[in-house]
Structure formats: structure tokens, C-alpha cells
Amino acid sequence: MSAIFNFQSLLIVILLLICTCAYLRSLVPNLLDKNKTGVLGIFWKCARIGERKSPYVAVCCVVMAFSILFMQ
């Protein structure tokens, strides 16, 4: 099933996008900082969410991992 129609898969994709963008911005800041607007600005916004809300994102990742491992 597509990640668009399955809510849990959609949450996984969003969490992975946030974590990946935050990690890439920590390695190469100029890569995401030059695209703050437009369609590519989504990646910059995801990186900002990952940096500023990192404890909440980490908790969500752990909860999602446990739900995938033990609930399915």
C-alpha cells in the first residue's frame, strides 16, 4: 500500500525526512540553507524542525520503532 493512504507509513516517511534533512544540514549546511523558499524549501523547513524539536522528534522515532516492531 502506498504511504499516502496508510497513516502509519505517512508518519514514518515524514519522520525519516525530518531526520535525514537535519543530519544533512549538520554535515553540509550550505546545501539546505540556499533553498529557503520554494519547493526545495520543504527540506530546509524539515531540517529546522529536526534541529529545534529534536527531543520530540527522537521520542516520536522511538515510539514509531516500537509500534512497528511490536504492534504489527
From Swiss-Prot:
Residues 27-53 are extracellular. Residues 72 are cytoplasmic. The keyword Nucleotide-binding does not apply. It is found in: Golgi apparatus membrane. Pfam families: DUF1242. GO terms for biological process: intracellular transport; protein secretion. Belongs to the KISH family. Involved in the early part of the secretory pathway. This is Protein kish-A. It comes from Xenopus laevis (African clawed frog). The lineage of its organism: Eukaryota, Metazoa, Chordata, Craniata, Vertebrata.
